[in-house]
Structures are given as C-alpha cells and as structure tokens.
C-alpha cells in the first residue's frame, strides 16, 4: 500500500504544471527523500514548498498522502482540508473528499 502511495505521489508531482523555481526544487527534494525513506526530510521540503506557494493545492495533496502513509490521521485530515480549500481542480477536490471520508470513518 505504501509503495503504491509513493508511486502515486511521484507521478502526481511529476505531472504538476504549477511548480516553478525554488518551490520546484523543494518538491524534487521531497520526492527524492520519499524514495529513500527519509520521510521527515520529505515533509520538511514540502513545508518549505508550502511557504513559497501557500495556496498550491498540489503541495497539500502530497503532504496528505505522505501523512496517510505514515498513519498520521490528524495531519492528513488537515492537509486534505487545505487541498480542498485551495484546489481549482474538481477532480482533485473529489479525491480529497474521498480520502477525508475514509479518514473520518476511523
């Protein structure tokens, strides 16, 4: 399951079209850290990216997926809610709501 989540995270990030400059560097570092199991470093890089672009829903989506993989339900919920708040993509919003429904069942 975790392997699939990280594969999805990698693909999602690769396809992101809104990543520029320093934010892009932080996202690449976050993915690299995930791939070698440095989850704390990955979160650190995602937090830096969110400071650079605090309204980028993709960043919060990646954070939420990472928190889910780490079984950190509370932070996953917070990140999914921010994803919904800033998302302009209907499909991303639907995906976030599905994850929130699942997380709220437990």
What are these model-predicted stretches?
Residues 62, 95-99:
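Canonical tetratricopeptide repeat
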Residues 49, 82-83:
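Canonical positions in the second alpha-helix
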Residues 23-26, 57-58, 91:
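Helix-start (N-cap) detector for alpha-helical repeat units in TPR-like alpha-solenoids
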Residues 35-36, 69-70, 99-106:
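Register position in tetratricopeptide repeats
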